[in-house]
A protein has these predicted regions:
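Specific alpha-helical transmembrane segments that line the substrate/conduction pathway
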Residues: 37, 43-45, 94-126, 244-263
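Hydrophobic/aromatic residues within transmembrane alpha-helices
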Residues: 28, 38, 42, 97, ...
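Transmembrane alpha-helices of multi-pass small-molecule transport proteins
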Residues: 30-89, 117-118, 168-172, 189-206, ...
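Hydrophobic transmembrane alpha-helices of multi-pass small-molecule transport proteins
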Residues: 50, 121, 130-149, 199, ...
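Glycine-/small-residue-enriched transmembrane alpha-helix faces in small-molecule transporters
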Residues: 1-41, 151-178, 219
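Juxtamembrane C-cap of transmembrane helices in multi-pass membrane transport proteins
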Residues: 17-33, 38, 45, 91-101, ...
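Hydrophobic/small/kink-forming positions within alpha-helical transmembrane segments
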Residues: 19, 84-88, 92, 112-120, ...
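Specific transmembrane alpha-helical segments of multi-pass solute transporters/efflux pumps
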Residues: 20-22, 57-105, 119, 147, ...
Length: 294
């Protein structure tokens, strides 16, 4: 398989895994957790799981795999910058946004902001060309996700927080390419390490007693494993094979997977607007992945 196919498959897997974030986060909030609790706890749990899983691998080997830069300090600095955008900014503002609006609306604003920011930051930071088909593909995919997910009501706080989260995520994907960091479990582990440190600050500021029960524990583990570990693994791997803009636009397929899961597991029939939106998203993904004419 060529790089485009492999990268697209990883990005689609990331979208499928990320489809679980909104629902689980909402359930955890209804169980008494606040946004700061969820963002920090899912990240530290994910970091713990990966640390145990990768315990026998020497640090030097992990760093050598992540980057060919000889200085460990430089590599950790680059990872710390990416973690601030891709973990702290994404998780912190995304979770707050879920507290101020419908999960579907948060997904629309966040993913649209990520796709658009990745396209333009890729132009200014990576000097990637922006072709007409890339612009049209991005707009089609954003229109598609809006048709499927937008619920009508909105909140200014939701829009602001989701936009910040999405823009940070888009810039994160560009900087991973700029720093030439090799995606995978090693990179994901260190992103989660720095992300846990950043997210500990708002968590401790808003510290309160948490009454853990089975639902809360299972919800946090679900968020830690599915979108946090596996989702970031797939996203960082996709960035190794294709541009940041292509990855972000492909991940706009997230609501398609969410709707398919609802159809399979809870027998919720797809609506006509879902079918129209899916056509727009798929057309957008095909267009942005189209090879430019020589």
């Amino acid at each position: 398989m060529n790089n485009l196919v492999i990268g697209t498959l990883f990005a689609l897997c990331a979208a499928a895994l990320n489809a679980s974030i909104g629902v689980i986060s909402k359930l955890l909030m209804h169980s008494g957790l606040n946004p700061q609790d969820i963002a920090f706890l899912k990240t530290i749990i994910a970091f713990f799981f990966l640390s145990v899983f990768l315990f026998k691998v020497p640090v030097s080997k992990k760093i050598a795999y992540i980057s060919s830069t000889p200085s460990k300090l430089s590599v950790f600095t680059q990872i710390a910058i990416c973690a601030f955008l891709g973990i702290f900014s994404l998780f912190f503002f995304e979770t707050i946004a879920y507290n101020h609006g419908a999960a579907a609306n948060v997904v629309v604003v966040l993913m649209a902001s990520a796709a658009i920011s990745a396209l333009f930051f890729g132009r200014f930071i990576l000097k990637e060309s922006i072709y007409l088909h890339s612009l049209v593909g991005t707009l089609l995919a954003v229109a598609g996700i809006s048709i499927i997910s937008w619920k009508g009501e909105n909140s200014l706080l939701m829009l602001i927080n989701a936009s910040i989260a999405g823009t940070g995520y888009g810039l994160f994907s560009v900087l991973v390419k700029r720093f030439k960091l090799n995606g995978g479990l090693f990179l994901t582990k260190y992103l989660l390490l720095f992300g846990s440190v950043y997210l500990a600050v708002p968590f401790l500021i808003n510290l309160h007693s948490i009454h853990f029960n089975t639902d809360i524990v299972l919800g946090l583990i679900g968020l830690a494993v599915l979108p946090t570990i596996l989702g970031f693994f797939c996203t960082t791997k996709a960035l190794s094979y294709m541009s940041a803009a292509k990855v972000q636009v492909t991940e706009l397929s997230e609501p398609i997977f969410a709707a398919l899961m609802a159809w399979v597991f809870i027998h919720e029939q797809p609506t006509l607007s879902f079918l129209y939106g899916a056509i727009f998203i798929i057309s957008g993904i095909v267009l942005i992945n189209k090879a430019p004419k020589a």
